[in-house]
């Protein structure tokens, strides 16, 4: 069998014979045999992790391993209750993490369009419609305008067949397909006698023979490469990994020092171990991973409502770190809808919004552009070449119905457009006779024009007329507009027109069109720059068109900031790393160029977001720190490679997502500050008790109760703090910036010190008579209540008490009330006293607990008033 790569070099007869022998179609029996051999026409699914694998991965964290060791030590020392509580806590966290991960994966599955589009194939000699997945090698498939191509294949017949291959090649202009063999080794975009899976028929009809299905298509090859690409860690994952390792080392060091001190002071080894276990449990924020997961999950829900679906939870925060956004042009920054912007009629430039159907010449332009046009509108879906749909849409806006115009002036013959002639002509019966209407490239048309229409009269065309037309055409083109000329010729009788009739034309006017920017793009780009993010346009379109759009929306200041892909080809990686700093628009780029551009920005220390919709974008989406796929125009391969999907294909949605990402990171920092300062307070109390030869102030169950119940709720509430728009007025944080900055550690130390002081005071008050249970109960209660109140301290770097901010988070109010009720239940319900190692407190002792807890909050709020930290 001839290799797939060579099919475009072979004749139709050779390919037919090679794939199907003497048959012109496949029988049902042959289809079944081939499906057993080649499989179905679908992309292979990656191997999924089982629920057990996901569950076990939750135990990889350093902090979790320390807790497991603590549980084993407790069990060895006979502290079975403490060991059981620690293990239950670890298991609960693992279950929560597993559930959230599986939920995210299930959400992704619901996004995938599992049903391939149907296709018309010849089976047993008859044309039948079947699901795309049932197509096999050797099938003969019929195509018409509006069809998606379900597999790769060799064109057998082409009736003006034009295919949009932008999803695969990035080329925005449709490709005219032929059936003749080609010579030499050609790149994908030049194989004009081949069609490819995922492409779209915009014009004409055709028939092709399937040569590749599933993973053997061009789409499948890219999907296969993606499966071999490793996942990149997001900045938050890297930060939390570093944070966990640093904290683990600090905790282990403190435990070792405390154990050694206890032994050196003559304490029993078992007691020394209990102190060390208490310290480990006090220091480790057990619920941190679950809290981060919950906060990110809430963030994804909020972002989904705004049009951004997050495939990978950690990418939510990753967006907040982005410093460069490499965006596609078509459909993301623009409307993905060709629109008429100007007419040139009767020697005048007329902006589209000023076109008047009451003007005879302008009405004639509107109607002629609709007649010499093959686009249709079926149930609201536009089918046809985008330039032609733009003409019909303008007529519709001006109150001219395409159907009524076509019914009034029926077409009797045509000369279809082809890329060599660059013209299209149609022949119509008019009220006053017969007219051939021609539209096409201006330079080609002017060579065939003998006359020009001015003020309702026809005159011989002059050199001055031609110069004026060429000047306007050049002005339009330099503004990034696509320009077509409209001309016509009257005939006395009906005839079947040919290319020979495309002469002695009357020039009517010019149509200038473009895919205009989205109305919100300019504001989004401005927000992007204000946030310290560099917006870059990367497109397969022409440089002039791309630069015109980029200038309109504020990405480009000067044409010197635009380049074409060929300029990159001759550069080394080092040269490109320097080059990207000054370039804002890349035109006529290939998938390889996109990957190199992304890498160059990353080499300069940037976090890069990359948008894309085509199969050809998939590898660049994977290479980027945050890959953003288009939900409307995006291919499934692009969506699978991305970490975020835009349901509205809108650049402005990315900026909203960046704002959400930054707010989420700030809120996670607040939650971590809250957890660490509370845990630091407990550490200080344990160390102070050891140095003062006092008993261990807390049972492990006390600390686990606080860390998991009364601490988790405020921490989650802090993670769900209202978003603040001022985050977009700051530059992206440095890639290597740690959560544990100097300022952050000072806040944790000061706040933890204040809380630790009041807790130690409570312990000493309770221990006046040597009652260890009373002392432990008071210390536990003050630590618990102080940390509940401390949630309000962590809301902002300034005082919030007696301000509206104190009450602006309903989750915080709920967290405080829930925690207070749980603490009250532990202290007031006798049946719980034994398990939690507490006793009932008298009124005076309760007042001391409430007073000391309140003091901790007031002191920290006072410090915030004096020094913002």
Which residues fall in each region the model found?
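Conserved cytosolic headpiece of P-type ATPases
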Residues: 1-729, 739-740, 753, 780, ...
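Helix-coil boundary and interhelical linker segments in multi-pass alpha-helical membrane proteins
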Residues: 690-699, 763-775
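Membrane-water interface at loop-to-transmembrane-helix junctions
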Residues: 734-753, 773-777
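Alpha-helix capping/termination and helix-coil
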Residues: 373, 605, 658, 662, ...
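Generic alpha-helical transmembrane segments
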Residues: 710, 755, 777-791
